């Protein structure tokens, strides 16, 4: 094998030596391509696996933790929620519409492959500076393309996109982040797993035909970008949501039968990863007859068939004798279905082309025992330079308030979420635009499931460990503010180039923060994804661990809103304000800096707040609640009253006026009627949570907070109309 071919497959000299040892000979091109894909960062997690191993993954309500297509938790009365968040960053930067659309398609397949009907989607989007003279126009093009791709796929599938977050920073100028989350619901006893066992059981290919799109996608997503990256468009997959809708319905029909052993979607590395993962998990072997693959293009080779990432395809291990019944279901839905192999006990993948053996590879070294790297780490030099920076107010508080509310990181994103169908399936209780976590009704048991997606990249830049812990806490707090109990998380860890020791240090610290927070807050990790090599021309993104928290409220009718719907409601701040300005939005806007330090998270205070919110809502004491986040109580209150029909007369009583922009954790704003005040304050005392009265909601169309005064019309204009102007 010549060195150029090996290098083109991103195989190092050390890895090639391992290949020779595993095979006992030189690989052919097909085998090299397969091994390259399975050992890519995207498929093998070779740089990250050692740090993920310590994640808390168990709890009495966890049915399935990491290692399957998605995580599963018990949501009561025999029902389960199946969910996962995943990235499609690199493809979305290269081809925003197709990249984002297939990102949605992939995460939907991960969930319905487990036997669940998908009932909700969320997304976390990070773009570069839309005001930048050089790249601002391109960033706006990326925003529009990505949003169009997500809405096209989700809307066509009939899956409501009910929430998300969108942030902008120059660190994403060369690498945008597109993280998609899906949640499905099924009976706890009806979950299907990705396994291939039982010697002689048939392996069946179902779904769309295979083309040349997405070739080398997994390897491409395991590398950084440079000027030549524009030529990678052919590696971006092309999605067809209508085919996926047929595939989902066919699979859900199949799941009502007893015909199959296991099922796996064909995602990154296509037929390669699905076959190796199924056999690897089961300790089996497999024969695949590649010439039987349904092909969309003529003249396709075994190499192309194994590595194509054409969308809307699944691999099924059926019970022997049920092949025709399985195929009949998929044919009914106008999909391809063909027996293309069988399970063996050899522990090897045997690849045939017109009955000739063209590839023979041991499965375990490519799946369960793929190489794990121990990359060097070192603390980034910038941390010592930024940690002592102190934020001081330099402009008028009213000016700063207005600047912040109309900033693209805070203002309303109706331009984005209005393109998503959030009400299809008629289960949505709280969707995007209503602040905080999104909520859906589970008709089968009367409960509701709340979900929130969270990632503050600036905080993770300032302190990767505490920043990651804060993401776990913040997502959970948003769920708690709906009245639900946070139960578990899914994570998507977006970082820079792992070959840079400073990036690996950030990643290791981020994992430590997630481990610590999940353990202390009793929200185990049940699924997730790692996206590395988010770097362009040597510049890495800020560390960006995206966390989705999922929780359950037993009675959907008790779901809390985040808006004040009545006048004369008492407005309270819960929790302590500690003067946290490190990595804050107010510092970024006023000083154009991301600096400072972060205080350790007080987990007892965080849990006490969650427990108080749950109990107070169960006792029907609260009218509304919202987590305090970016921009402190100033922005939290401004947004709550912008989406409300009433005005506000509020006083913070802080000694230092800038404290209204403090971003301390473990805080919430609540609204309650005056007759419930005493009972609530007694309960807060019982839980050890400080409650500070800020004022009341009023019938006057006016917003007042300390010295800040705006008419309701001015407040609404700043919040609701700014982004539409900025993105044009």
Curated annotation (Swiss-Prot):
Mg(2+) 1 binds at residues 86, 529. The active site is at residues 42, 88. One of its GO terms (molecular function) is ATP binding. It is found in: Cytoplasm. It is an enzyme of class 6 (ligase). Keywords: ATP-binding, Cytoplasm, Ligase, Magnesium, Metal-binding, Nucleotide-binding, Purine biosynthesis. Gene3D superfamilies: PurM-like C-terminal domain, PurM-like, N-terminal domain. PANTHER family: PHOSPHORIBOSYLFORMYLGLYCINAMIDINE SYNTHASE SUBUNIT PURL. Belongs to the FGAMS family. This is Phosphoribosylformylglycinamidine synthase subunit PurL. It comes from Campylobacter jejuni subsp. jejuni serotype O:6 (strain 81116 / NCTC 11828). The gene is purL.
